[in-house]
Amino acid sequence: MIKHIWVDADSCPLKVRNHTVDYAAKKGITVYFVANKQIECQSKNPFNMIVTDTQKDSADNYIFEHTQSGTDLVITRDIVFADRLVSKGVPVINDRGTEFTKEIIKERLSERDFNLQLVQLGLSKPYHEGYDQKKFEKFANCLDRVIVKNL
């Protein structure tokens, strides 16, 4: 049963943070935002903000050390970090509605490495996808599905 939602909050959209806190409050789940700086959230429901130091991966390492299989869910965009968590048995989703599995992580890492090679060779430019209502709805549905699946 999911008791805690941990959010790798540095790059998590405000709309996702607000929804996560509101959704968790209805389900009696505790939310932790972890980042290397204070992160805004406009929800009136309670949440915990953990500010780590500014070392590379300090927020990821904090989340990894404090999560457990069976009681925790993590929201992150970081595929390498998701791989560490999934190996530990912790369910992981991103803010675009993907539930990470070993297979999906392997596929995404391969895509990322290929795209990075194209950029390094000058054959492509870095691409940063926008965040729209459709992606948010996929996230909200995925969050609900994973929570219900882990009741």
Located regions from the model:
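Nuclease catalytic cores that cleave nucleic-acid phosphodiester bonds
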Residues: I2-L151
